[in-house]
Amino acid sequence: MCGRYVSPEQASIERAWKIDRTSSNPFPRRFNVQPTTDVPVLRLDGRALVLEAARWGLIPHWWKQDKPPSFTINARLEEAADKPMWREPLRGSRCLLPAEGWYEWQALAGGKQPHYIRRSDGRPACFAGLMSIWRDRPSCAILTRAAAGPVAQVHDRMPVVLADAAHAGWLDPALKDATRYAREHALADEFTHYPVSKRVNDARNEGPDLVEPLRP
């Protein structure tokens, strides 16, 4: 799964993608993004690439209860086409979540050790995402897959990080088989990771020191 990540500031997002329109206040750089908070997402509106805020934790448009559903921050790629929660967004409401990297917790004999995972080339690790609008509020989920490459040393799941050339295709409303597309265009071996401070465990902690390598 992916339960915490690092979100780039808006200026970095605008340098990496040709944004046509923004519909939110400027996004700051965040080093400890947690579920249910608003995060930057990229989506298509017609032909325009829009940067906007969405709640991390998808709420389907048909949700009847006042309390949002639990456990909707991640959608398993291998199940998304069949599950009612994900099926409709996968078909017609896909998005991208810009990220610098993410955290995973490695199970060790003495407890869980957080690791920071990022692309080896330093480029943004853009997550494939799903969106929905509930009571006029956008929300989103990150697609995940079985871990591969170096990430498998830390955890058994990882976000679907799309290759740069696949971003436009993922957002294209004409895409027919999104599951296959994500599987074929997901990065696997292009990552590095290292242990970081357990300060990241507390969602109240924030700052660049969270991604500093843990000193022996």
Predicted regions and their residues:
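Short linear sequence motif anchored by a di-proline
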Residues: 1-216
